[in-house]
UniProtKB/Swiss-Prot annotation:
Keyword entries, A-Z: ATP-binding, Cell membrane, Membrane, Nucleotide-binding, Repeat, Sugar transport, Translocase, Transport
Gene coding for it: rbsA
Record-linked PROSITE patterns: ABC_TRANSPORTER_1, ABC_TRANSPORTER_2, RBSA
Record note on quaternary structure: The complex is composed of an ATP-binding protein (RbsA), two transmembrane proteins (RbsC) and a solute-binding protein (RbsB).
One Gene Ontology cellular component: plasma membrane
The name this protein goes by in its record: Ribose import ATP-binding protein RbsA
Domain of life: Bacteria
Function noted in UniProt: Part of the ABC transporter complex RbsABC involved in ribose import. Responsible for energy coupling to the transport system.
Limits of the ABC transporter domain: 3-240, 250-494
Enzyme Commission number(s): 7.5.2.7
Species of the source: Shouchella clausii (strain KSM-K16)
Family the UniProt entry places it in: Belongs to the ABC transporter superfamily. Ribose importer (TC 3.A.1.2.1) family.
Single GO molecular function: ATP binding
InterPro entries, A to Z: AAA+_ATPase, ABC_carbohydrate_import_ATPase, ABC_transporter-like_ATP-bd, ABC_transporter-like_CS, P-loop_NTPase
Topological relation to the membrane, as annotated: Peripheral membrane protein
Length: 499
């Protein structure tokens, strides 16, 4: 074993987050680490990499017992971490990012050997199949290319154990394929990977073993070839979840929202579709297809350059989000932490912000009404909090997303737009969010769901609009849905608009 962690325990302020957890890595394997948010995955890896000291237990790396006190100690033993939020300095060049802290200099003068650094950087990146100029500004590259730069940086420190945290969360399908090719190529050279992800399909196609944690406890380690999706889900949540998606028994009614020939220069062109009350209308497409731009324009985040929007067959103009809100449209954005929540505010305050009329008496906010709204919405959506004053930033990803959805339900929306509703959310919370969406649709809410996960699009949608390069290629009925059909149109198949 290249890594052995035995009986690891860790507490913070009396709260035990790891309880006698064991974890092993075989040389040259890709080992998935899974568990719901809050299961202890990140804490365990932070102990391995020297960010946190362990309270109890033993860590052995390459046969020797270690007690790292700093990430640099782990780096010396060949351990590197590639975080979900990449450590790229966008204004520096590609080479400067690769050599940061280890620059080639002329003696002790501090002058950089820029040419030598650039040549070596391009050589290292070429070995990963990435052809970029080392002098290019790193921030101008796609997230997928930035991720390969992070891998190259790890290899330049002679890392042979690489920990990857949600590496594909912001990548296109093509970038994911490239990343997997690189990972498999490095595996053949003996590099070992810990792969942390909620995406079950990726784990089953890439990894050899999987370790599951639950509530800070070690649950099981399985050989991928000898287990199943359902078994892993049960290990993660401690119960049978049933089907991944709710039974599809929705009965759409009258047209609630009509989008007619809407365009925005350089983003999308002549997009037309209708959404009925009581349906979940999916919008699929590859990254850059214009999906988020369309729904943000419907909500008034972006100004339309042409086209019309109708609510209940009446034309409306949204110059800003408040106009959309006043017309009964709610929006759960792709980035919940910057656009959906005020993370330093309490859960109760976040719920009150969009429901000021409900929680006010005259011109003053009523603490009693705020508490009543908090209790109603938290119960309705099953938000797990320590209390109304818990900061939103300390919630798990799934509970943060439930708060973002909950804050809109007080206004009883006619239309609910969800952009990547389960991104970064564990499998148990996904199931709960799907159930919430289904119940809202049954109550007559017209739901628009943008998602990059094709199983989610197919499992949840009544109909699906597929976009490619700013154009709506096709609206598919539920009985037409398949991954192959969606990808056909998402990659430009039949390059003309279908309705």
């Amino acid at each position: 074993m290249i890594v052995e962690m035995s009986q690891i325990s860790k507490s913070f302020s009396g709260n035990q987050v790891l309880k006698n957890v064991s974890f092993t890595l075989e040389k040259g394997e890709i080992h998935a680490l899974m568990g719901e948010n809050g299961a202890g995955k990140s804490t365990l890896m932070k102990i391995l990499t020297g960010i946190y000291p362990r309270d109890e237990g033993v860590v052995r790396v390459k046969g020797k017992e270690v007690a790292y006190t700093h990430p640099k100690d782990a780096e010396k033993d060949g351990i590197a971490v590639i975080h979900q939020e990449l450590n790229i300095l966008p204004e520096l060049s590609v080479a400067e990012n690769l050599f940061l802290g280890n620059e080639y200099t002329v003696g002790k003068t501090g002058w950089l050997k820029t040419k030598k650094m650039n040549e070596y950087a391009e050589q290292q990146l070429a070995e990963l199949g990435l052809k970029v100029k080392a002098s290019d500004r790193a921030g101008a590259l796609s997230v997928g290319k930035q991720q390969l730069i992070e891998i190259a940086k790890a290899l330049m420190t002679n890392a042979d154990i690489i920990i990857m945290d949600e590496p594909t969360a912001a990548l296109t399908d093509r970038e994911i394929d490239t990343l997997f090719t690189v990972i498999r190529g490095l595996q053949e050279k003996g590099v070992t990977f810990v792969y942390i992800s909620h995406r079950m399909e990726e784990i089953f196609s890439l990894c050899q073993r999987i370790t599951v944690l639950r509530d800070g406890n070690y649950v099981s380690t399985k050989v991928i070839a000898e287990t199943s999706f359902d078994e892993i889900v049960k290990l993660m949540v401690g119960r049978e979840l049933g089907g991944r998606y709710p039974d599809h028994d929705l009965e759409p009614g009258a047209v609630k929202l009509a989008v007619k020939n809407v365009s925005r220069k350089n983003e999308f062109e002549s997009v037309t579709f209708e959404v009925r009350e009581g349906e979940i209308f999916g919008i699929a497409g590859l990254m850059g297809a214009g999906r988020s731009e369309v729904v943000e324009s419907i909500f008034g985040y972006r100004h339309l350059h042409s086209g019309t929007i109708e609510i209940d067959q009446k034309p409306v103009v949204f110059k800003r989000p408040v106009d959309a809100i006043e017309n009964g449209i709610a929006f759960v954005p792709e980035d919940r932490k910057t656009k959906g929540l005020i993370v330093n505010f309490s859960v109760r305050d976040n719920l009150s912000i969009t429901n000021l009329a409900t929680v006010s008496s005259g011109n003053m906010m009523s603490s009693t009404k705020e508490q009543a709204l908090y209790q109603e919405l938290v119960k309705k959506l099953g938000v797990r909090t320590s209390g109304p004053h818990q900061k939103a930033k300390s919630l798990s990803g799934g509970n943060q997303q439930k708060v973002v959805i909950a804050k809109w339900l007080g206004m009883k929306p006619k239309v609910l737009i969800l952009d990547e509703p389960t991104r970064g959310v564990d499998v148990g919370a996904k199931k709960e969010i799907y159930t919430i969406m289904n119940e809202l649709a049954k109550q007559g809410v017209a739901i628009i769901m943008v998602s990059s996960e094709l199983p989610e699009i197919i499992g949840m949608s009544t109909r699906v609009a597929v976009m490619f390069e700013g154009k709506l290629m096709k609206v598919l009925d539920r009985n037409e849905l398949s991954e192959e059909t969606i990808m056909h149109y998402a990659t430009g198949g039949d390059k003309h608009v279908h309705q």
